[in-house]
């Protein structure tokens, strides 16, 4: 088992592991347990009831948080001509075509958080699947990152649109703010995220879709949420 720091163990004492916290109390507590010397990210971890062995139950999509994540998002766009110009004007950090593909392949360039591509670029960037796929960076129509509306996509991801996907255990992990955020902003982000994820329930999932939700800071312990109180908001 990994050894936890003294700071983590002290923070853990503040959390009742048997309790499901209402959101107001959970947000207060997650900030209290975020004791690192940097502005910790507040994360939402969701356990779903999907069967990961069934590909039609995998979840991949995007949601928009009303107050963003507090993180500066670096956006890369694969596009040519007019679409490349639109992406640049919308604020994309990197725009290119074959030149960017080569930079990623040969130099291992990965200094970006989101990659967007116009549909005509997919045959060019297909060979990047092995590099970008495992990192969750490969453009995909499901996540809204393969589109001709590049300017709109760039602006949305810069503003706070984030990708949601289930890992191999059927869990979802997303940032919902920073410790420095007002409590109300974190709370509104959490409510919005859970309600949007509820809309992504695959048709084949039987029984309860969201089984458990936990709030935690980067270096802090998990705080279980009372889901019913959130869904009633």
From Swiss-Prot:
CDD domains this protein is in? Ribosomal_L1
Q: Which GO terms describe its cellular component?
A: large ribosomal subunit
Q: Which terms are listed as keywords in the entry?
A: Repressor, Ribonucleoprotein, Ribosomal protein, RNA-binding, rRNA-binding, Translation regulation, tRNA-binding
Q: Which InterPro entries match?
A: Ribosom_uL1_bac-type, Ribosomal_uL1, Ribosomal_uL1-like, Ribosomal_uL1/biogenesis, Ribosomal_uL1_3-a/b-sand, Ribosomal_uL1_CS
- Coiled-coil regions listed in the entry: none
Which Gene Ontology BP annotations are present? regulation of translation; translation
What is the role of the protein in this entry?
Answer: Binds directly to 23S rRNA. The L1 stalk is quite mobile in the ribosome, and is involved in E site tRNA release.
Q: Which PANTHER family match?
A: 54S RIBOSOMAL PROTEIN L1, MITOCHONDRIAL, LARGE RIBOSOMAL SUBUNIT PROTEIN UL1M
Subunit field text: Part of the 50S ribosomal subunit.
The UniProt entry's sequence similarity note says: Belongs to the universal ribosomal protein uL1 family.
Question: What is the recorded name of this protein?
Answer: Large ribosomal subunit protein uL1
- Per the record, the gene is rplA
């Amino acid at each position: 088992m990994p050894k936890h720091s003294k700071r983590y163990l002290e923070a853990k004492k503040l959390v009742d592991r048997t309790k499901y916290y209402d959101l107001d109390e959970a947000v207060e507590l997650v900030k209290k347990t975020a004791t690192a010397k940097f502005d910790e990210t507040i994360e939402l971890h969701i356990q779903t009831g999907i069967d990961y062995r069934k590909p039609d139950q995998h979840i991949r999509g995007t949601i928009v948080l009303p107050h963003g994540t507090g993180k500066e998002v670096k956006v890369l766009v694969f596009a040519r001509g007019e679409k490349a110009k639109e992406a640049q004007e919308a604020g994309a950090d990197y725009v290119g075509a074959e030149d960017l593909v080569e930079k990623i392949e040969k130099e291992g360039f990965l200094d970006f958080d989101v990659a967007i591509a116009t549909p005509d670029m997919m045959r060019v960037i297909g060979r990047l699947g092995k590099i970008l796929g495992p990192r969750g960076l490969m453009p995909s129509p499901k996540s809204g990152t393969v589109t001709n509306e590049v300017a709109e996509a760039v602006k949305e991801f810069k503003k706070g649109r984030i990708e949601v996907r289930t890992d191999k255990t059927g869990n979802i992990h997303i940032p919902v703010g920073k410790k420095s955020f007002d409590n109300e902003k974190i709370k509104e982000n959490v409510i919005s995220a859970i309600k949007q994820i509820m809309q992504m329930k695959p048709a084949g999932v039987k029984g309860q879709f969201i089984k458990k939700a936990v709030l935690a800071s980067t270096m802090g312990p998990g705080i279980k949420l009372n889901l019913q109180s959130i869904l009633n908001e």
